[in-house]
Amino acid sequence: MYTTYKEYLKQETSLPFEEAMQIWNQIAERGKADAACRELIDRFLKCAVDYVRIRNGWNQKSLAEKGQADAERTRCHNLVISAKNKLSVYMYEHKLGNDWDDWLGEERKRIGDFACYVVLLQGLEAR
């Protein structure tokens, strides 16, 4: 467990907040005029919220609780990755640009962290 953001950033697969926001801004800006793309963005957001809901309380769970929740956490993480991949393919095929996906990469932890940042931003926007 990391006690500070600085400690988190020392990890090989860390994703700095600023980088995550640059990626998210590219997705949002490029996809806003395309209804089908907005639906894929909304799907990603729903999957991200479901995943983050489980992940947020992970460090407070007992070992037994983690064992019970692990399959669901993995399932939700897989759905986040799938939604991200579908969004990327759509944006590529419709010439909206998906260079953000190369920047984000395919590392599971990094994609999960991206989902956490996006959910944080959504929470701030909801105030």
Describe these PLM feature segments.
Residues M1-T3, E7, Q11, Q122-R127:
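Short intrinsically disordered terminal tails
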Residues W24-V49:
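Short, charge/polar-rich alpha-helical segments
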Residues G31-C37, G57-D70, E93-N98:
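Charged, low-complexity interaction regions
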Residues I41-D42, A64-S82, W100-G105:
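Short, charged, amphipathic alpha-helical segments
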Residues S82-R127:
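Amphipathic alpha-helical binding modules
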